[in-house]
Amino acid sequence: MSFTLAHFSDVHLGPVGLSDVFNDFRLKRIVGGLSWRFRRRGLHINSHADGLRADILAQVPDHICFTGDLVNIASKAEFRRGLEWLKSFGEPPAVTMVPGNHDAYVKAAHETGLGLFNAFMQGDGSASDHAFPFVRLRRNVAIIGLNSAVPQSLRKAGGTLGPQQRVALEMRLKDLGA
């Protein structure tokens, strides 16, 4: 039985407008907004992301996984735009998301930030807001979502899996017979 999984990441949807930077003020957002404006704007082009989406949907995959960096500076406006874009791939049972470091660029309110994506970031039968790692079973495939995205200081961008997630992952893998 075949299973087609479409996987992609790092679309960094733009543009990053001044209102994204100043209406949701953090010093790191100013630095990131300027970086986007003067360096990254030519790298992260929405028409490329839209072309990727069209190509993925034309392949009619069994499931779609997006693994981070939907946005640039984690502003409320970016998250709202990103949610609409991600929804255009399909309903949450058919689309899985885990955040990347730019999705956790700064500490942000869950309900107006990553919380908007809860339905895409939870396991089968789970309604928890913070359910990493989560497991989604799709036919003969287990999709396991981990979250290494943590807000970092001004000049840093990275991530880590804490001991709690690693222990939970080990338990989930045992439950799956792996």
Language model feature labels by segment:
Residues 63-67, 97-98, 178:
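Short beta-strand segments at enzyme active-site cores
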Residues 1-79:
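N-terminal active-site segment of His-dependent metallophosphoesterases
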Residues 80-176:
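Extended active-site neighborhood of metal-dependent phosphoesterases/phosphodiesterases
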Residues 35, 177-178:
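Proteins with a high burden of low-complexity, intrinsically disordered sequence enriched in S/T/G/P/A and R
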